[in-house]
Structures are given as C-alpha cells and as structure tokens.
Design a protein with these regions (language model features):
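Active-site helical microenvironments for divalent-metal-assisted chemistry
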Residues: 1-146
Length: 146
C-alpha cells in the first residue's frame, strides 16, 4: 500500500507469502479455492517461496533473473519490511551483516528494476542498518571512567 499498488493478486499474496514456509498443513487447494484470484495468488506465492532444493542464493537469483514483475515487487516489499524490523538489540550482528549483503546483491537490483521508490528506501535502510552496526561496534558498550 505504501507504494500505491492496488493489484488484488499482489495484495492477497503479500498477506500469505510465507504460508508454505511457516505452516506445514496448508494445501495448495485451500489457497486456490478461496476466490476467483486463488490460482493467481497461489502461483505468485509459489514464485516467491524458496524451494526445498534451493540455497538462499539460488532462490534469490531465481527471483531476480526469472521472476515476474509482481514477484519482484513482493520480494522487495517483504525485504523492506524485514529490514525495518532488523535491529542490533534483537538480532545478531553477524546475521544483520549477512542479510544486508544479501539485500545488496540480490534485492537491490530487483528494486532498481521494478520501482525507484523501493530502490531508494532499500538503499536508505541498508545505510541505516550498516551505520547501526558501526555505531554499536565502536561506541558500545560504554565504560565508566571513574
């Protein structure tokens, strides 16, 4: 919604995009039979779902190189949401660094392709998360000098 996308398939898929990774007892038929967009929603969700035989890099490469426009938009929006919640007080710094590197390598090019505003926001989030890593590494913990 932040980027004014009103495509019903994209919006529905954005709500359930992690369902097959997070919920083991959901069947494709449950998604497909929900409404007239069910098949298209299912197809989009599967397009942004990592396959069991894929490494994370293989998955992100697949979306970047052969994903549909909607899949790339959905992946970028998901990564923006995840980066927004990624802070050193709740996540390990090593995980944050790896996530940022992954975003630069795979998701930034997607955003550049599909939406300049998403690209700008991702670059800004990366900059802020990197500066947070640097800040915590060089300033904290504070030590008393008395």
């Amino acid at each position: 919604l932040d980027y004014h996308y009103m495509d019903p398939v994209l919006l529905k898929a954005s709500i359930i995009h992690d369902i097959f990774e997070d919920v083991k007892c959901v069947s494709p038929d449950e998604i497909i039979s929900l409404d007239q967009d069910g098949k298209a929603v299912y197809d989009l969700v599967m397009e942004v779902t990592r396959r069991k035989d894929e490494s994370k890099d293989e998955y992100l490469r697949r979306v970047l190189e052969s994903g549909s426009q909607l899949a790339k938009i959905l992946k970028c929006a998901d990564r923006i949401s995840n980066l927004t919640d990624l802070h050193t007080d709740t996540f390990d710094k090593g995980f944050i660094k790896k996530y940022i590197d992954e975003t630069k390598k795979w998701v930034l090019p997607m955003a550049e392709e599909v939406n300049p505003n998403m690209h700008y926001e991702l670059k800004d989030l990366i900059r802020r998360r990197e500066s947070g890593l640097h800040f915590h590494r060089t300033i904290w913990p504070l030590t008393r000098t008395d």
